[in-house]
Amino acid sequence: MSRIEATFRALEDQGRKALIPYVTAGFPFADITPALMHGMVEAGADIIELGVPFSDPMADGPVIQRAGEKALGLGIGMSQVFHQVREFRKRNGTTPVVLMGYANPVERYEQIHGQGAQQGAQGAQEAFVRDAAAAGVDGVLVVDYPPEECTAFAASLRARGMDLIFLLAPTSTAERMAQVAQVASGYVYYVSLKGVTGSGALDRSAVEQMLPRIRQHVRIPVGVGFGIRDAATAQAIGKVADAVIIGSRIIELIEDQEHAKVVPVTIDFLRGIRKALDA
């Protein structure tokens, strides 16, 4: 059983829902990520999604795009992300960490450190998987990897105790859901809005209608993200989903903070979300 699976099982036994905050690695300061991750756990986070900066993030809205651009400017790449996870693991060996990003940084890392050029785009990615596992990563979400081409990658991750997570959207067909169900593990991330991260207001009724359709195909937990900006919305989504995922709002709150305030501001916000989820 992976750490992510164990986390969801424990939460289910407690009658609680998972709080999954997202932050871009190396944002807003290159050295702050491990401390920020610890702050998230202190505030009640159950799983942490750590964004891998990329220069062409097609699914991200302007807020997370800015975060990625700043992190790239600070020299944050995949090797630095692994280092940040290792630093976090020195004090926390239990909270699952999921890397969320795009194919290009994964493949670039593989070409430098492994045999990626020979394996093909969605190969087993052995060097990436090896080093992710060694760093203490628990799951990977690659936005632009199609599930039908990820059998080897998923098997490689699972062999090292990691999960491969996929997105589903309001436009996802039954066929797509079935394809995702074949290879996904850990949880599925349901994108509650059409468009990019941080866009629009979440429609709870639409989410309520979609989740039973997803669960006809997917037997693992379903987390909902995109458009969750406050405790009331998080509480409403927590009543129907297995996890609440919050990213853009956290980035907005910390992007202009001075170094000393980044962690306290994040803790304060997430404590409010946690309290609402547990109410």
UniProtKB/Swiss-Prot annotation:
Which controlled-vocabulary keywords does the entry list?
Answer: Amino-acid biosynthesis, Aromatic amino acid biosynthesis, Lyase, Tryptophan biosynthesis
Task: Tell me the PROSITE patterns matching this sequence.
Answer: TRP_SYNTHASE_ALPHA
Molecular function per GO: tryptophan synthase activity
Asked if the Swiss-Prot or TrEMBL record annotates the protein with the keyword Amino-acid biosynthesis, the reply is: yes
Which InterPro entries does the record cross-reference, listed alphabetically?
Aldolase_TIM, RibuloseP-bd_barrel, Trp_synthase_alpha_AS, Trp_synthase_suA
- Enzyme active site: E49, D60
Pathway annotation? Amino-acid biosynthesis; L-tryptophan biosynthesis; L-tryptophan from chorismate: step 5/5
User: What EC number(s) are associated with this protein in UniProt?
Assistant: 4.2.1.20
Pfam families assigned to the protein according to its UniProt record, in alphabetical order: Trp_syntA
Q: Which reaction does it catalyse?
A: (1S,2R)-1-C-(indol-3-yl)glycerol 3-phosphate + L-serine = D-glyceraldehyde 3-phosphate + L-tryptophan + H2O
* Keyword Lipid metabolism assigned: no
Which branch of life, at top level?
A: Bacteria
Name the enzyme group at the top EC level. lyase
Its cellular-component GO annotations read: cytosol
Summarizing the function annotation, the protein's role is: The alpha subunit is responsible for the aldol cleavage of indoleglycerol phosphate to indole and glyceraldehyde 3-phosphate.
**SUBUNIT field:** Tetramer of two alpha and two beta chains.
Q: Which family does it belong to?
A: Belongs to the TrpA family.
Sorted alphabetically, which NCBIfam families does this protein's record hold? Answer: trpA
Can you say what this protein is called? Tryptophan synthase alpha chain
Q: What is the lineage of its organism?
A: Bacteria, Pseudomonadati, Pseudomonadota, Betaproteobacteria, Burkholderiales
